């Protein structure tokens, strides 16, 4: 029995024929804020848990170099008895190389698949900052980016979808 390892396949060069897929070139925090206007009083134990209003936005734009910038904005506003407890907002960006995707399929890739890559990192930032702010970790449930995309698309076309 031998311990041999096969060499990993060579990565295709940019623009190589037949190349398909999404490649993350960079990811970064574009903007980040946390407010706890009534601390330390808002940190008191007991009372009703805060009501949390979540917001999700996705945007994408092409760049002259052929890459795409995708932004995922997550915001959470917590209130208790109509008083603000905390407000956190992160605008997390990614720079993507996308190859082999037909023009008609590009928008869903940019606004569904790319945010799926960015979400875990933006979610962790929010969890970490709420913990550092003295609150229990705020873990955002997984987001159905395809559902958000479909609802926004329908809304833009004037179709009523649920309570969107």
From Swiss-Prot:
Pfam families: SecB. One of its GO terms (biological process) is protein tetramerization. Keywords: Chaperone, Cytoplasm, Protein transport, Translocation, Transport. It is found in: Cytoplasm. InterPro entries: SecB (IPR003708), SecB-like_sf (IPR035958). GO terms for molecular function: unfolded protein binding. Signal peptide: none annotated. Belongs to the SecB family. Homotetramer, a dimer of dimers. One homotetramer interacts with 1 SecA dimer. One of the proteins required for the normal export of preproteins out of the cell cytoplasm. It is a molecular chaperone that binds to a subset of precursor proteins, maintaining them in a translocation-competent state. It also specifically binds to its receptor SecA. This is Protein-export protein SecB. It comes from Caulobacter sp. (strain K31). The lineage of its organism: Bacteria, Pseudomonadati, Pseudomonadota, Alphaproteobacteria, Caulobacterales.
């Amino acid at each position: 029995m031998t311990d041999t390892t096969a060499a990993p396949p060579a990565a295709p060069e940019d623009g190589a024929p037949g190349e398909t897929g999404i490649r993350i070139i960079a990811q970064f925090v574009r903007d980040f804020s946390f407010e706890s206007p009534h601390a330390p009083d808002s940190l008191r134990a007991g009372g009703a848990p805060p009501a949390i209003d979540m917001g999700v936005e996705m945007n994408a734009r092409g760049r002259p170099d052929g890459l795409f910038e995708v932004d995922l904005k997550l915001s959470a506003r917590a209130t208790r008895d109509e008083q603000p407890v905390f407000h956190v907002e992160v605008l997390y960006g990614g720079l993507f190389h996308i190859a082999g995707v037909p023009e008609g399929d590009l928008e869903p890739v940019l606004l569904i698949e790319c945010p799926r890559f960015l979400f875990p990192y933006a979610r962790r930032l929010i969890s970490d900052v709420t913990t550092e702010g003295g609150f229990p970790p705020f873990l955002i449930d997984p987001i159905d980016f395809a559902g958000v995309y479909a609802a926004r698309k329908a809304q833009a076309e004037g179709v009523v979808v649920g309570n969107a």
